[in-house]
């Protein structure tokens, strides 16, 4: 091979196949539990022995499994939106949000382990569906794309707030994680709005809430 051919091969731009391979690799890391957090684990309160009854432990595990599924969906959704987004600044914002959600994913996974539980068995389904939804959302244009991100974060905030009301008071470790996640989601929503995200039509917001309800109801048990 000539020197010029070698340089051309080494300097080629990443193509669609490279992007696809990268997304598959990321999906496998998310679904296998291999993702690791870049920030410290928020659950710093000591785990008091016998602080939770068996019923409370199962309930806390169910809620944290729902939260874990939410982060799986967020990863896929934002990666799907970014994959088809042609505006560089919006694409970078979506990728940054997805990167920060990796922390939430790892935190929820660790808390499930501490509670003697496991992630949802349906995570491959949630990831695939959310990625496809993200790709579709991106074709609505940048303002709607970012509006979808903002509305997603708004609904997740409300959902986490509900968990803070129902988690056992003595389960400080789960509560610390959920509180930190809620703060991060508020920042993501504000970032999307500042970047030009517009409110979604009421029917779309309602459909998102209905889909979320199906997901949370199923993930609590499975």
Swiss-Prot record:
Cofactor(s) demanded: Fe cation
Keywords: Cell membrane, Iron, Membrane, Metal-binding, Monooxygenase, Oxidoreductase, Ubiquinone biosynthesis
A Pfam family per the record: COQ7
Domain of life: Bacteria
EC number: 1.14.99.60
Reactions that this protein is recorded to catalyse: a 5-methoxy-2-methyl-3-(all-trans-polyprenyl)benzene-1,4-diol + AH2 + O2 = a 3-demethylubiquinol + A + H2O
Chain residues that bind Fe cation 2: 101, 153, 185, 188
Coiled-coil residues: none
GO biological process, one term: ubiquinone biosynthetic process
Localization, UniProt: Cell membrane
Any one Gene Ontology molecular-function term assigned to this protein's record: metal ion binding
Residues annotated to bind Fe cation 1: 71, 101, 104, 185
Cofactor note: Binds 2 iron ions per subunit.
SUPFAM superfamilies found in the cross-reference section: Ferritin-like
Entry GO CC: plasma membrane
Pathway per the UniProt entry: Cofactor biosynthesis; ubiquinone biosynthesis
Topological type in the membrane: Peripheral membrane protein
Main EC class the enzyme belongs to: oxidoreductase
Function of the protein: Catalyzes the hydroxylation of 2-nonaprenyl-3-methyl-6-methoxy-1,4-benzoquinol during ubiquinone biosynthesis.
Family to which the UniProt record says this protein belongs: Belongs to the COQ7 family.
HAMAP family referenced in this protein's UniProt entry, alphabetically: COQ7
Name this polypeptide is given: 3-demethoxyubiquinol 3-hydroxylase
Originating species: Bordetella parapertussis (strain 12822 / ATCC BAA-587 / NCTC 13253)
Taxonomic placement: Bacteria, Pseudomonadati, Pseudomonadota, Betaproteobacteria, Burkholderiales
Gene from which this protein is expressed: coq7
């Amino acid at each position: 091979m000539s020197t010029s051919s070698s340089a051309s091969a080494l300097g080629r731009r990443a193509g669609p196949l490279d992007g696809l391979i990268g997304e598959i690799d990321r999906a496998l890391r998310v679904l296998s539990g291999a993702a690791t957090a870049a920030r410290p684990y928020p659950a710093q309160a000591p785990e008091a022995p016998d602080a939770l009854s068996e019923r409370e432990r199962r309930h806390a595990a169910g809620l944290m499994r729902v939260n874990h599924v939410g982060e799986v969906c967020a990863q896929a959704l934002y990666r799907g939106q970014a994959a088809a987004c042609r505006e560089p600044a919006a694409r970078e914002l979506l990728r940054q949000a997805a990167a920060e959600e990796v922390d939430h994913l790892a935190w929820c996974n660790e808390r499930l382990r501490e509670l003697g539980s496991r992630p949802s068995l349906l995570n491959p389904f949630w990831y695939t569906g959310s990625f496809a939804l993200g790709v579709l959302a991106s074709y609505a244009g940048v303002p709607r794309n970012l509006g979808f991100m903002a509305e997603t974060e708004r609904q997740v905030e409300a959902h986490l707030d509900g968990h803070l009301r129902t988690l056992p008071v003595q389960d400080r470790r789960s509560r610390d994680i959920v509180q930190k996640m809620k703060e991060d989601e508020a920042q993501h929503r504000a970032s999307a709005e500042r970047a030009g995200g517009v409110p979604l039509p009421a029917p779309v917001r309602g459909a998102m809430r209905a889909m979320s309800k199906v997901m949370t109801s199923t993930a609590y048990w499975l």
